[in-house]
């Protein structure tokens, strides 16, 4: 894959981008210019098509990181007297709970072990206990540990019970199938610097037309008002406030490459090959994956840390980095673990090279693989 000579980012975003995507940022754009506005329009149309939302959903782009768009979606879709159920099995679910608190939206936490997925049965039980719940906010791929939550069954449940569904698809959009026709949702949030393989700086919300139209006045914020952003764009073709022009241009190039590759099925298959090569190679070195294969998303893999006393993550991270690979620093699980991403402009050959580099570092540090640490550090 052509990407230049930068280090390989083994993270769930930002991630390694292609050379063409990098080169797309070498041109300057006027944010009011018709050519730039046409790029924005084409992006929105293509993003809606990826989830088969033509006619039912619209795309509202938003400046900033993906979290900006998650907050915007909750603030707009959930009325001020609404109540949000948050199935919580990782760090990004916890972030949604914090957003609800800051927004003044009532929320209910549904605790789930970090190595297990949310299920429709658990969510239905929580809603039966508290019928005042109006919405469910579900992280699709919880990259704290790498769990893939079953979106289709959760979407069907919310539809059956008449509850709104907000999906954080930050780390799944473009890699894992999402079909608005069979997985009904009120709003779905993703961002440029993830599985489409753009660079960070813009999020977007795919929202049902009628839900967006009913959201006028819900937002706590001027800058994060999805309704106002959409209405202004429809009237003027422009963004309300200065957009990240270079990010948008790079995303257009990244999306073109995504479509040329074959779209979600082919992109997802490449990431699955990456994941399989990583897990198999790490197992040969003696590492054990934190999650069972049945719930492991092909986005990022969490591994138990070696039990050897000579293991120190900072040293391990630095020495792997010296070999051209940047791991995801730190852990988000209760147990001592580290994470390796499978996404970006990389393939399974690169993943095997990563495993080789990790093996070299283990030998260099004198680490002998034993049973994983059983307790939190």
Swiss-Prot record:
<dbReference type="InterPro" id="IPR024169">
    <property type="entry name" value="SP_NH2Trfase/AEP_transaminase"/>
</dbReference>
<dbReference type="InterPro" id="IPR012703">
    <property type="entry name" value="NH2EtPonate_pyrv_transaminase"/>
</dbReference>
<dbReference type="Pfam" id="PF00266">
    <property type="entry name" value="Aminotran_5"/>
</dbReference>
<feature type="modified residue" description="N6-(pyridoxal phosphate)lysine">
    <location>
        <position position="194"/>
    </location>
</feature>
<keyword id="KW-0032">Aminotransferase</keyword>
<comment type="subunit">
    <text>Homodimer.</text>
</comment>
<dbReference type="GO" id="GO:0019700">
    <property type="term" value="P:organic phosphonate catabolic process"/>
</dbReference>
<keyword id="KW-0663">Pyridoxal phosphate</keyword>
<dbReference type="InterPro" id="IPR015424">
    <property type="entry name" value="PyrdxlP-dep_Trfase"/>
</dbReference>
<dbReference type="InterPro" id="IPR000192">
    <property type="entry name" value="Aminotrans_V_dom"/>
</dbReference>
<comment type="function">
    <text>Involved in phosphonate degradation.</text>
</comment>
<dbReference type="InterPro" id="IPR015421">
    <property type="entry name" value="PyrdxlP-dep_Trfase_major"/>
</dbReference>
<keyword id="KW-0670">Pyruvate</keyword>
<keyword id="KW-0808">Transferase</keyword>
<comment type="similarity">
    <text>Belongs to the class-V pyridoxal-phosphate-dependent aminotransferase family. PhnW subfamily.</text>
</comment>
<dbReference type="InterPro" id="IPR015422">
    <property type="entry name" value="PyrdxlP-dep_Trfase_small"/>
</dbReference>
<dbReference type="GO" id="GO:0047304">
    <property type="term" value="F:2-aminoethylphosphonate-pyruvate transaminase activity"/>
</dbReference>
<protein>
    <recommendedName>
        <fullName>2-aminoethylphosphonate--pyruvate transaminase</fullName>
        <ecNumber>2.6.1.37</ecNumber>
    </recommendedName>
</protein>
């Amino acid at each position: 894959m052509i990407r230049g000579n930068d280090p390989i980012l083994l993270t769930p975003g930002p991630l390694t981008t292609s050379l063409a995507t990098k080169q797309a940022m070498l041109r300057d754009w006027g944010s009011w210019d018709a050519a730039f506005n046409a790029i924005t329009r084409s992006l929105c149309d293509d993003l809606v098509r990826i989830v088969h939302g033509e006619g039912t959903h619209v795309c509202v782009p938003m400046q900033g990181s993906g979290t900006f768009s998650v907050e915007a979606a909750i603030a707009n879709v959930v009325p001020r007297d609404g109540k949000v159920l948050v199935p919580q099995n990782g760090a990004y679910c916890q972030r949604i709970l914090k957003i609800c608190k800051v927004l003044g939206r009532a929320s209910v936490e549904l605790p789930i072990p970090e190595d297990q997925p949310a299920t429709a049965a658990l969510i239905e039980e929580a809603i039966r206990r508290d019928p005042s719940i109006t919405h469910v906010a579900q992280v699709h791929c919880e990259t704290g540990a790498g769990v893939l939550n079953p979106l289709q069954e959760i979407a069907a449940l919310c539809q059956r019970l008449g509850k709104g569904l907000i999906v954080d698809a930050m780390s799944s959009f473009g890699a894992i199938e999402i079909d608005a026709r069979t997985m009904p949702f009120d709003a779905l949030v993703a961002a440029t610097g993830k599985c489409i393989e753009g660079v960070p700086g813009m999020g977007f919300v795919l929202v049902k037309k009628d839900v967006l139209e009913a959201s006028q006045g819900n937002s706590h914020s001027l800058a994060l008002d999805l309704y106002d952003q959409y209405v202004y764009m429809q009237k003027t073709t422009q963004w309300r406030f200065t957009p990240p022009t270079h990010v948008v241009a790079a995303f257009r190039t990244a999306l073109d490459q995504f479509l040329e590759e074959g779209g979600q099925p082919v992109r997802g298959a490449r990431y699955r090959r990456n994941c399989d090569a990583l897990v198999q190679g790490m197992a040969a070195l003696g590492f054990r994956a934190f999650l069972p294969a049945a719930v492991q998303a092909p986005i990022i893999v969490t591994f138990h840390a070696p039990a050897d006393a000579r293991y120190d993550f900072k040293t391990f991270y630095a020495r792997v980095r010296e070999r051209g690979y940047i791991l995801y620093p730190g852990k988000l699980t209760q147990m001592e673990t580290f994470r390796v991403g499978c996404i970006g402009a990389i393939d399974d050959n690169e993943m095997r090279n990563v495993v080789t580099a990790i093996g070299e570092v283990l030998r260099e540090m004198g680490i002998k693989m034993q049973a994983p640490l059983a307790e939190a550090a």
